[in-house]
């Protein structure tokens, strides 16, 4: 399924008609597949989006990593709703900072995290990217699903990397080899905050057989 997606993307790029916005949409489709799920086409009923489960490779990698952390608190960043469903199945007791989590509930989650009572915290970077103080305990950030936005990427990490943090922050990227995950990482490393950088990174990724391999 992923190979078919990438073949279609390559044809579109070679046509010269792909804009930065088109590239962002295409990358999101490829990223879903790499993560282990995908939204199905809209059935026209107006119901909530239907998803299909594809694999658990990333989820299993996260489980292994959390085990290696030996109880060190970690915050896991996710993107899509079906990412969260897989992570909830893997970590059923983990609290979630995401859409609709506000007020006293959010305050309670933050207090427990900073008190060291939460071994695994699931968070959407857009919900936990600004204003939250999470530096009281854990120093491990796990990106289950990368964002191409440098601002969102940096702000999410800075929730832990703030005054009062006593440890070095360690950032782990769960990446599917030979997928758009690598293009997204290229975009982040270029430290360019414009959407055009993603399109450029996707083009370089498609031509990866002729460019130097980058270690992450």
Which stretches of residues belong to each language-model region?
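Short beta->alpha connector loops at strand-helix junctions that form conserved
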Residues: 98-100, 144-147
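Short, well-ordered beta-strand core segments
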Residues: 121, 140-141, 160
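Flexible glycine-rich beta->alpha loop in the catalytic core of nucleotide-sugar glycosyltransferases
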Residues: 128, 147-148
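A conserved SF2-helicase RecA2
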Residues: 148-216
């Amino acid at each position: 399924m992923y190979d078919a997606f990438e073949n279609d993307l390559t044809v579109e790029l070679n046509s010269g008609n792909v804009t930065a916005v088109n590239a962002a949409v295409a990358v999101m489709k490829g990223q879903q597949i790499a993560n282990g799920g995908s939204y199905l086409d809209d059935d026209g009923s107006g119901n909530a989006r239907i998803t299909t489960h594809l694999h658990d490779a990333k989820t299993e990698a996260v489980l292994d990593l959390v085990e290696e952390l030996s109880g060190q608190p970690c915050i896991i960043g996710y993107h899509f709703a079906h990412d969260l469903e897989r992570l909830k199945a893997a970590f059923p007791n983990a609290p979630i900072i995401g859409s609709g989590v506000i007020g006293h509930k959010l305050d309670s989650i933050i207090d427990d995290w900073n008190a060291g009572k939460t071994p695994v915290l699931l968070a959407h970077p857009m919900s936990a990217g600004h204003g939250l103080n999470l530096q009281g305990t854990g120093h491990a950030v796990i990106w289950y699903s990368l964002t191409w936005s440098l601002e969102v990427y940096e702000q999410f990490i800075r929730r832990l990397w703030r005054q009062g943090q006593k440890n070095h922050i360690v950032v782990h990227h769960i990446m599917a080899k030979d997928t758009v995950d690598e293009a997204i990482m290229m975009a982040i490393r270029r430290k360019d905050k414009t959407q055009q950088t993603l399109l450029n990174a996707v083009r370089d990724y498609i031509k990866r057989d002729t460019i130097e391999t980058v270690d992450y």
